[in-house]
Amino acid sequence: MGRREEMIAKIKELMTQPERIRNMGIAAHIDHGKTTLSDNLLAGAGMISEELAGKQLVLDFDEQEQARGITINAANVSMVHNYEGQDYLINLIDTPGHVDFGGDVTRAMRAIDGAIIVVDAVEGVMPQTETVLRQALREYVKPVLFINKVDRLIKELKLGPNEILQRFAKIITDVNRLIKRYAPEEFKSQWMVKVEDGSVAFGSAYYNWALSVPFMKKTGVSFKDIVELTNKGDLKGLRQKAPLHVVVLDMVVRHLPNPLEAQKYRIPHLWRGDINSDVGQAMLKCDPKGKMVMVVTKIILDKHAGEVATGRVWSGTVKTGQEVYLINSKRKARIQQVGIYMGPERINMEAVPAGNIVAVTGLRDAMAGETVSVEKIEPFEALHYTSEPVVTVAIEAKNVKDLPKLIEALRQLAKEDPTLHVKIDEETGQHLLSGMGELHLEVKLYRLKTEWKLDVDVSPPIVVYRESVTKKSPIVEGKSPNKHNRFYITVEPMPDEIYEAIREGIIPEGRPKNPKEVAKKLAELGMDYELAKGIVDVYNGNMFFDNTKGIQYLNEVMDLLVDGFHMAMDEGPLAKEPVMKVIVRLHDAKIHEDNVHRGPAQIYPAIRTAIHCAMMKAGPVLYEPYQKVIINIPYEYMGAVSRELNQRRGQLIDMRQEGEVMIIIGEAPVAEMFGFAGAIRGATSGKALWTTEHAGFKRVPNELAQQIIRQIRQRKGLDPNPPTEKDVCPQQ
């Protein structure tokens, strides 16, 4: 095992030299080659065998588990790369595989300082490339560009060198346009990617070769040589002349920042505490002697060790046996094992210093996004997931004895993919799986079958709707069952600007730590500052304000009122679907002095009924989720595809031609999109490539709303007739 020990010794030595560390990720549109690139980088750095890496995608799904273990489960892989005679430690963090991470600040982006953006040379910059790039730049992650699948330009599209260079120039211009739009002010110009300085590389991850201008200058290999070797089919020659991992990892070392550089500008942006405090200064300097602070970015279930939490160490040193605080969970824990990932295996270490990615056990119940420190400090900005699951299926194990295995599998899927919501009901054995669309759920169900060998019954897919209001309600009185407590509230629709600010994370979900600051932001967005100061809670895109003056005992029941507000928002009055874009204001209250008469059994019904009654007086409406569909098709199928979209209440947003291919971008309600895959394959003889992403919610047309409310109520075992104001509001 000489080589392995040598590698571990090298990693241990480099861990203490932050200027030699690079924490990076790979981000791409689906199918642009992220996995192949990461596997081949690992193979090149000697972490998995080269044979495996090439074949990994050729093997089919089941046998792939060992081969694939690395891309499915490894949260982070450390490798050593020699650049100009010096060794560097490169931590590659696996960004979640599925592209349905819509707007979430993917946990991985928090832990890395730089990212390789992968773009398919044939398809160019796609909508999801924009999503991941925006994500990275929002977290102050510096990008470099890898243009992949260049072999297809040479062999399939038979383009000459000049046409290929034109294609590259367009992709680079498109990427730089996005960098200019989304990068932080101070980095807009210096983070642009350029061919001449080597912050752009191009090649084929599948065939394991790559080129960049610095590499061509250094070795004398020219693009013409590559074209000749590709046309000859000399794959070995390609790999030897222009090895992928050398070119790409050289680019990483040269252009992506080390933790010492990156933390100077990232900490003030990501952390809300006082930068001049000891901890603040230690994090700015990435000081291994400071107080230990780490942020958990991913949780993996290890068969032997239980839950392993991986995360970034911002300051201090993580040590075995250390007593730590989990800041968000408000509890203590003791770190048991400390280690790092080398390839797919976890290597135990005594300690891991600042600037590294660590894997620890012992942090029971920690969620991704948790701040862990040796003392109570301000937590890092919450990781907010703005993607909203819009389709649900119910799953049951066909065989009762598979139940524990199914629960385990669902929990694991949910931990790997934050956009998947799993509701486990151990009593009925019926579990709900909610995802971003039919396709997203199909992929997950396929994995239950192939990887977990589970036989399950799946219900037809159900769309998740939302309820909202269209105008301000009059003041409504809510009385507790014992008549001793009265609350006077109104509801009103939330302005789009405020809703967007919540989705973007500018206004954080939850009870605000600093209400004045949130009120200031709300005032900037057009709300009266005096009213905005009453902000109590932000919940799933809804808000609760206390606009009362000097009410006795109100503080004692505020927690109960917030819980009641949550209940009212989880199930709206029309069809018990979640509520969105509603502002609830408390204007006045009369509260019994004796706390026996103002417990949960009195307060919950009072506030919940009042909110629902106010909603019924405020023009209640149903919203439905929409999907954006991006379809690539040969020109002659244009008509068939637009017909298919029109039949589904969809509309065309944009069309553009790239060579022989038409790219159509449309939007349609998720409810109409079931079976779209089969229909589109049929209409285009299987020649369409397509992806979808979440496109927010829109109002259901009035003529359909009543019918849909009926269907939902029937499915939930409620009286199918849509409720009226009389049904919801208590008779005085």
Curated annotation (Swiss-Prot):
Summarize where GTP binds, as residue positions: 28-35, 94-98, 148-151
Q: What does this protein do?
A: Catalyzes the GTP-dependent ribosomal translocation step during translation elongation. During this step, the ribosome changes from the pre-translocational (PRE) to the post-translocational (POST) state as the newly formed A-site-bound peptidyl-tRNA and P-site-bound deacylated tRNA move to the P and E sites, respectively. Catalyzes the coordinated movement of the two tRNA molecules, the mRNA and conformational changes in the ribosome.
PTM-bearing positions, type Diphthamide: H597
A single GO cellular-component term from the record reads: cytosol
| Family membership noted in the UniProt record | Belongs to the TRAFAC class translation factor GTPase superfamily. Classic translation factor GTPase family. EF-G/EF-2 subfamily.
Q: Which residues are in the tr-type G domain? A: 19-230
Keywords, ordered alphabetically: Cytoplasm, Elongation factor, GTP-binding, Nucleotide-binding, Protein biosynthesis
Is Nucleus included in the keywords of this UniProt record? no
> Record's superkingdom?
Archaea
Can you name the source organism? Thermococcus gammatolerans (strain DSM 15229 / JCM 11827 / EJ3)
Q: PANTHER family attached here?
A: ELONGATION FACTOR-LIKE GTPASE 1, TRANSLATION ELONGATION FACTOR-RELATED
Q: Which Pfam families match?
A: EFG_C, EFG_III, EFG_IV, GTP_EFTU, GTP_EFTU_D2
How is this protein named in the record? Elongation factor 2
UniProt-recorded Gene Ontology molecular function terms = GTP binding; GTPase activity; translation elongation factor activity
The cross-references to CDD domains, in alphabetical order and at most eight, read: aeEF2_snRNP_like_IV, EF2, EF2_II, EF2_snRNP_III, Elongation_Factor_C
Location within or outside the cell: Cytoplasm
Whether Transferase counts among this entry's keywords is no
InterPro entries to which the protein is assigned, alphabetical: EFG_II, EFG_III/V, EFG_V-like, EFTu-like_2, G_TR_CS, P-loop_NTPase, Ribosomal_Su5_D2-typ_SF, Ribsml_uS5_D2-typ_fold_subgr
